[in-house]
Amino acid sequence: MFGALIKKLVGSKNERELKRMWPIVERINQLEPELVKLSDEALRGKTAQFKERYSRGESLDSMLPEAFAVCREAGKRVLGMRHFDVQLIGGMVLHSGKIAEMKTGEGKTLVATLPSYLNGISGKGVHVVTVNDYLAKRDSDWMGRIHKFLGLSVGVIVHGLEDHERREAYAADITYGTNNEFGFDYLRDNMKFDLDEYVQRPFNFAVVDEVDSILIDEARTPLIISGPTEDSTDKYYIIDRIIPLLKRGEVIEVEANTLSGKRKTYTGDFTVDEKAKSATLTEEGVLKVEKLLKIENLYDPRNMEVLHHTQQALRAHALFKRDVDYVVRDNEVIIVDEFTGRLMPGRRWSDGLHQAIEAKEGAKIENENQTLATITFQNYFRMYERLSGMTGTADTEAEEFHKIYKLDVVVIPTNRPLLRPDFPDVIYKTEREKFNAVIGEIKELHEKGQPILVGTISIEKSEELSELLKRQSIPHFVLNAKQHEKEAEIVAQAGRKGMVTIATNMAGRGTDILLGGNPDGLARQEFKGTPEARTEEFMAAFMETLSKDLPEKELLQSLEREYPGIMPVVASCLKQEGEIDLEELEQQVLAEHQKQFNLLVEKNKPVCAVEHDEVVALGGLHILGTERHESRRIDNQLRGRSGRQGDPGSSRFYLSLQDDLLRIFGSERVSMIMDKLGIEEGEAITHGLITRAIENAQKKVEAHNFEIRKHLIEYDDVMNKQREVIYTQRKEILAGNEIRDSFTGMMEETVGDIVSAYVIDRTPAREWDWQGITDSVQKVFGFHLDLTPDLMDRITPVNFEETLRTTARERFQQRLTEFGDDLMDHLIKVIMLQVIDAQWKDHLLSIDHLKEGIGLRGYGQKDPKQEYKREAYKLFMDMMLRIREEVVEKIFWVQVGSEEEMEQFELEQPQQRMVFNLVDEEAASAPAQMPSKSKRSAGRNDPCPCGSGQKYKKCCGK
């Protein structure tokens, strides 16, 4: 009560934030009349002035009003788009490192240009992050025109670019790209052997579009770079064959003499918990599996892998559905994104689950991969100096954004009032009744011409609904993961009169639905693509036709049919000698294509305008949801496709008690309400109690998913600190910063490690583990300890350690004299990197194994999280010790042969490698002598034995 009164008097936090920004909007508006008078050159010159002021120490914050005003003026001149006042506020929110919640159709893409331009002035780099390659390319081409006009450079990162192209794109003032590409580039950079090969710069400022999708929906999916293992795939087929023989059971509560008066009993061979997405064998099931696989004890430590793969096979059969969670295409299992409905080729479930599903579907089983590098989006984006984001739906997840990313959400008011009524949910008892009602409403609205966007939560449901519409002869488009190539094209026209579009979840997100149709989209359909794409096609066809050596007339005629109106351009570029400047031709063809395309856009504008008015009169775009998603935010995103920029529209959800959400999380409560109200089969109910019960079910799931993500980040934070240590160490090595000192430090720490392991404090030296000491010193440093009885009586742990250190330093000085400073520094650098990378890879595998079994610690009354932190730390310290020892050992033993001895290396390589292994194995017990130089030899053009990846003549053979 008191809180509500305070809120009424001083306003909510959001209102106070907006109130603070309106005076700045006024200042920006006051600058507009002066900027309108400037020529294009003078407006562009403002950027150079801003850069000069920034270099003199002026802050970006103080330049914000002027920079935003300049960017707005450029938008008017280049794109014919003027930023609204509320968009200026959105830009300020982003610049301040917060999340701007802006409703669909309010121009988020245009808003991003404001903070991008302002922060681009610093030259430190701005990353504009989108969810897919299409949007990254579209936005860099479209909005990038504003930045280029103002003199800033623009790059785009999409799949398939070479390293030099990526480096160039990251060097730009503003770089557009996808979250996946940014994350993988970071991991790839930290696996490289040369700082000059890095593509990314230090992380400065990021604007994340669809921030909820990337930072929340994707948060449970770590980015992983992996390499294949050699394990056999037969085990997956063997286990998969027994799963259909197991009977699914239930968990039943029976009366018992316990505190609660009840106990759980299990039927069948396994039970399934759909909330936790887990499947568990019962006692009967364990016995049956042991019998079928002919093993004595499934829980024997030697059979833990069999148990693990059996549980994953159970999950594959009981919890993962084809055309819902994945599709099978060309004998390959491809994951479907549960939030967008898009296919995710290249992504794989970990922990053997993907292989279990491949076995279930009879698809080719790919080997399990070993992790080489990994990071979660949560930890990747927390590395930016300043992070901001925008979306249509963030307020429901405001708590999570603040707790995990320290990001506040500011809700931006709409430019025009929202006119879309969201009708109450309609609930039926069965899915069949629900679909009959959905078809009835679609038919009714379609007959009067109102466009309808139907939202489904899976490919399976969208195709089922499509079949029902076909039976009613209702024309429609289906947009799901199987048609994602046409996604933007179909969604852009979903607002046309009489259009029925079925879309899986948020497919087509990022594309505006204009009532009456999109003139630009219609022009693309008629033109068979964009001017740039058609020009690229034409140039390829032209070069192919040229290769056929046809006479000039025939050449022009063959192309005229496919590219009408282009031949006069070709003719004008042909010189008298029959030569042609291809670069000039491409520019001329692009100009002609742009002209033709613009004519088509202008032709479609009046058609769309008339249709727009008709659709508005019919009530705008109607959103028809066929099932509630686990998250209210996803439902709000679907609703948000209608009612953009003050357009009319409406939305309604049709549900049934058989829907997953209600069946798993809320059916008892809803079913009880329906029974009390006496709902018969075929009848629907619309009631506030039901709506609240559904919202409560969604809140439960959201809280559950938040806990999972929080749990993940708490575990990954441990790895994140370790990753930072390793990657920082790698960078310092690559930069060559005091590399000799680093090695000397490793060498002295290794001496300390040996002393700690074998020397016992406060005991006579004769009782120390001298066998362990001499073996270790011989193995690592390559010298033999010659200890006299007299020395043994006088030695102490302190002077013994100092003696070892002195001897090791002298031995290293000998190696330095032998190799020379430059070669030794190069060897230290390469060997350090090789050892760190190999040990880090093994460490990641150990961490994976630790994660798999850590949950069982709970049964021993131990906190799994604390146990994980403790054991992960121990594993990390053990790895650091191994790194030190291996680096020191390799430096003390490595040999590079003379140039004359290298020529036989290629022929002898397999045998030589065998010898190297033997030499390494024998080194521990051999007397202090170096391996023969002839044992490591390479030809001038062979890969250098040091492992740098370069040819020997350009590396150690210089």
Curated annotation (Swiss-Prot):
It is a peripheral membrane protein. Its main location: membrane. The keyword Iron-sulfur does not apply. Its EC number is 7.4.2.8. It is found in: Cell inner membrane; Cytoplasm. It is an enzyme of class 7 (translocase). ATP binds at residues 87, 105-109, 512. Its cofactor is Zn(2+). One of its GO terms (biological process) is protein transport by the Sec complex. The keyword Chloroplast does not apply. Zn(2+) binds at residues 944, 946, 955-956. It catalyses: ATP + H2O + cellular proteinSide 1 = ADP + phosphate + cellular proteinSide 2. Keywords: ATP-binding, Cell inner membrane, Cell membrane, Cytoplasm, Membrane, Metal-binding, Nucleotide-binding, Protein transport, Translocase, Translocation, Transport, Zinc. InterPro entries: Helicase_ATP-bd (IPR014001), P-loop_NTPase (IPR027417), SEC_C_motif (IPR004027), SecA (IPR000185), SecA_CS (IPR020937), SecA_DEAD (IPR011115), SecA_motor_DEAD (IPR014018), SecA_preprotein_X-link_dom (IPR011130). It comes from the Bacteria. PROSITE patterns: SECA, SECA_MOTOR_DEAD. One of its GO terms (cellular component) is cell envelope Sec protein transport complex. One of its GO terms (molecular function) is ATP binding. Part of the Sec protein translocase complex. Interacts with the SecYEG preprotein conducting channel. Has a central role in coupling the hydrolysis of ATP to the transfer of proteins into and across the cell membrane, serving as an ATP-driven molecular motor driving the stepwise translocation of polypeptide chains across the membrane. Belongs to the SecA family. PANTHER family: CHLOROPLAST PROTEIN-TRANSPORTING ATPASE, SECA INNER MEMBRANE COMPONENT OF SEC PROTEIN SECRETION SYSTEM. Monomer and homodimer. Part of the essential Sec protein translocation apparatus which comprises SecA, SecYEG and auxiliary proteins SecDF-YajC and YidC. This is Protein translocase subunit SecA. It comes from Citrifermentans bemidjiense (strain ATCC BAA-1014 / DSM 16622 / JCM 12645 / Bem) (Geobacter bemidjiensis). The lineage of its organism: Bacteria, Pseudomonadati, Thermodesulfobacteriota, Desulfuromonadia, Geobacterales. The gene is secA.
